[in-house]
């Protein structure tokens, strides 16, 4: 099995490639950056250094310029998986090219699985809505992905990423005869997994940034791991996650052991100084994050309506409002 991946940036090379390179025979990257395409085709090598001191070399790769995509039809027979990491707002720019691949697969009665590995909710399903020429051989499968990859220039000698990664697949959207790809996690309760990540990890990120800004300022703590050396910050993180866990257990009946294990995993990642996670970055888009039906108010409102402990959730919302007021 071969793989086509749209996006030869840090996520494509630092996340997708090291996870799938040992599973597929070959990875064809597609990108519109000629320097990256030339580097991959010349060196035939991607080097990865992980937070656990692992060094990974990926050699079963080549790259195509986006505008040359149609010229490589001769390789498409062996491609059964298409993955994408170009940013949700850029998906519209590859519709034409993906459509050509879909038409080819339908014409030749071949299966194709498409996974949008983007930071969003059910992005593959969203991408599917852009196409009308589909049949039962084309599968858009939603995934939940998470891995911190350094913002090092992809043209450097190597990329850095944390050893941890999350790649959860909605099993219900796969063909019944699909042979599961190793290194991925398959679930029939995909929405529950999304819920955990949004309200425990994503919401904590911005809440932590607002808390540090209010109590210490970003001049004292620039990165997450630095702030986690302060006992007051550690206490906030623990109390925040404990209140979220109460809500998720009450609302979705998610097992407490599962939630607490995820909490411990989050805290371990926050404490790592291998990848420097910028607090200012985590505080971005505050107005959106404070809006109704978003990561903060959804949990806070449920806790209040059901008489669950919510002191820290409320504090976080107030911190966010203060940050917004000072950073318009």
Curated annotation (Swiss-Prot):
Gene Ontology biological process terms from the UniProt entry: mannitol catabolic process
Enzyme class (EC, first level): oxidoreductase
Highest taxon in the source lineage: Bacteria
EC numbers: 1.1.1.17
InterPro entries recorded: 6-PGluconate_DH-like_C_sf, 6PGD_dom2, Mannitol_DH_C, Mannitol_DH_CS, Mannitol_DH_N, NAD(P)-bd_dom_sf
A cellular-component GO term for this protein: cytosol
UniProt GO molecular function: mannitol-1-phosphate 5-dehydrogenase activity
Keyword terms, alphabetized: NAD, Oxidoreductase
Coiled coil: none
Isomerase recorded as keyword: no
Pfam families hit by this protein: Mannitol_dh, Mannitol_dh_C
NAD recorded as keyword: yes
PANTHER family: ALTRONATE OXIDOREDUCTASE-RELATED (PTHR30524:SF0), MANNITOL-1-PHOSPHATE 5-DEHYDROGENASE (PTHR30524)
Recorded family membership: Belongs to the mannitol dehydrogenase family.
Protein's name according to its UniProt entry: Mannitol-1-phosphate 5-dehydrogenase
């Amino acid at each position: 099995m071969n793989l086509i991946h749209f996006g030869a940036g840090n996520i494509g090379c630092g996340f997708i490639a090291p996870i799938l390179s040992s599973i597929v025979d070959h990875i064809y990257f597609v990108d519109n950056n000629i320097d990256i395409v030339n580097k991959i085709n010349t060196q035939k090598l991607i080097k990865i250094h992980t937070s656990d001191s692992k060094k990974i070399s990926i050699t079963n790769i080549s790259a195509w310029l986006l505008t040359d995509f149609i010229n490589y039809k001769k390789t498409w027979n062996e491609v059964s998986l298409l993955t994408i990491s170009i940013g949700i707002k850029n998906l519209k720019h590859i519709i034409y090219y993906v459509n050509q691949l879909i038409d080819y697969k339908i014409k030749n009665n071949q299966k194709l699985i498409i996974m949008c590995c983007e930071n969003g909710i059910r992005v593959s399903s969203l991408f599917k809505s852009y196409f009308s020429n589909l049949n039962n051989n084309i599968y858009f499968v939603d995934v939940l992905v998470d891995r911190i990859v350094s913002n090092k220039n992809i043209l450097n000698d190597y990329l850095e990423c944390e050893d941890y990664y999350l790649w959860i697949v909605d099993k219900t959207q796969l063909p019944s005869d699909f042979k599961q790809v190793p290194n991925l996690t398959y679930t029939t309760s995909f929405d529950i997994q999304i819920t955990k990540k949004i309200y425990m990890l994503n919401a904590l990120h911005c809440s932590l940034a607002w808390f540090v800004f209010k109590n210490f300022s970003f001049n004292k703590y620039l990165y997450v791991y630095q702030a986690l050396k302060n006992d007051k910050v550690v206490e906030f993180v623990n109390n925040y996650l404990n209140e979220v866990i109460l809500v998720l257990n009450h609302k979705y009946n998610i097992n407490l052991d599962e939630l607490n294990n995820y909490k411990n995993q989050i805290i371990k990642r926050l404490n790592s100084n291998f990848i420097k996670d910028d607090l200012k970055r985590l505080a971005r888009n505050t107005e959106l994050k404070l809006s109704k039906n978003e990561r903060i108010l959804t949990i806070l409102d449920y806790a209040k309506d059901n008489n669950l402990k919510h002191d820290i959730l409320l504090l976080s919302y107030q911190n966010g409002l203060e940050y917004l007021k000072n950073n318009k």
